[in-house]
């Protein structure tokens, strides 16, 4: 499925949820399903040609038992349109669209040593200001190869203040 198609499905789900005043509940269901799909590798099951449509449909029937009316209608629409293999991608796109709507993001910070809580708080404040976000989760990754400094990445926007990059720039200027 193309990203455009998954965006259409996710937009439709979010619009209906908003109309019915159930946006938070639907987003909670979407998060739970994404987690379930990852833990049980359901994306591979639904996208596999090995399993029959009826086997995949049984899985959807199981999900319908605990789903809200809006989510049930959505899952039935995806099933009737023959898009079960794309359901994982659609759910991911729904979460991304909601994060954009509410200005929520995970921000990756690569540093040469683990960040302290105080540093994480500073990066959170900086990311909120630089990337215009309301809610930030800082994910720190240690990479000793950057020598010092940090690299911040949020949705493809990168701030590279690593010592390795600065030294490479100086070397390029000298040569």
Curated annotation (Swiss-Prot):
SUPFAM superfamilies per UniProt: N-terminal domain of the delta subunit of the F1F0-ATP synthase
Disulfide cross-links: none
Annotated keywords: ATP synthesis, Cell membrane, CF(1), Hydrogen ion transport, Ion transport, Membrane, Transport
Main location, first listed in the record: membrane
RNA-binding as UniProt keyword: no
Ranges annotated as spanning the membrane: none
Keyword presence, Lipid metabolism: no
Membrane topology: Peripheral membrane protein
Superkingdom: Bacteria
PANTHER family referenced in this protein's UniProt entry, alphabetically: ATP SYNTHASE DELTA CHAIN
HAMAP family listed in its UniProt record: ATP_synth_delta_bact
Function: F(1)F(0) ATP synthase produces ATP from ADP in the presence of a proton or sodium gradient. F-type ATPases consist of two structural domains, F(1) containing the extramembraneous catalytic core and F(0) containing the membrane proton channel, linked together by a central stalk and a peripheral stalk. During catalysis, ATP synthesis in the catalytic domain of F(1) is coupled via a rotary mechanism of the central stalk subunits to proton translocation.
Subunit structure of this chain's protein: F-type ATPases have 2 components, F(1) - the catalytic core - and F(0) - the membrane proton channel. F(1) has five subunits: alpha(3), beta(3), gamma(1), delta(1), epsilon(1). F(0) has three main subunits: a(1), b(2) and c(10-14). The alpha and beta chains form an alternating ring which encloses part of the gamma chain. F(1) is attached to F(0) by a central stalk formed by the gamma and epsilon chains, while a peripheral stalk is formed by the delta and b chains.
Name the UniProt record assigns to this protein: ATP synthase subunit delta
